[in-house]
C-alpha cells in the first residue's frame, strides 16, 4: 500500500514537472538550466520519472500554484461565468424593443 501511494505521488510530481516544462517551453527551460534543448527531451524520458520517485520517497512535494491557477481559469472559461459589471445596476443601459 505504501509503495502504491509513493508511486501515485511520483506520478503526480512527474506530471507537475512535465507540465511546468511544457508551460515554459523546452527551449527556455534548457536555456535556464544551461543545456541544449535535446538534453531536456532526454531528461523527460529518462531522468524525470526517476527524480519524481525520489522526491516522492523523500516526501518532497511539488507545490504547483501556477497549475492550480490555470485550472481555475480553464474551469471559469468552460462554465462561461460572466464577469460582474463594473457599474452600478442603475447605470447600466437598458434597451427595449
UniProtKB/Swiss-Prot annotation:
Any GO molecular function: DNA binding
Ranges annotated as DNA-binding: 26-45
Swiss-Prot/TrEMBL keywords: Activator, DNA-binding, Early protein, Transcription, Transcription regulation
Any single biological process term in GO: regulation of DNA-templated transcription
Keyword rRNA processing assigned: no
Top-level taxon of origin: Viruses
Coiled-coil ranges per UniProt: none
Entries under SUPFAM superfamilies matching the protein: lambda repressor-like DNA-binding domains (SSF47413)
Pfam family, one: Phage_CII
Task of the protein: This protein and protein CIII form a complex that is involved in the initiation of lysogeny. The complex binds at either of the cy regulatory sites preceding the CI repressor protein and integrase coding regions and induces transcription of these genes.
Family: Belongs to the lambda phage CII protein family.
Name of this protein: Regulatory protein CII
Annotated organism of origin: Enterobacteria phage 434
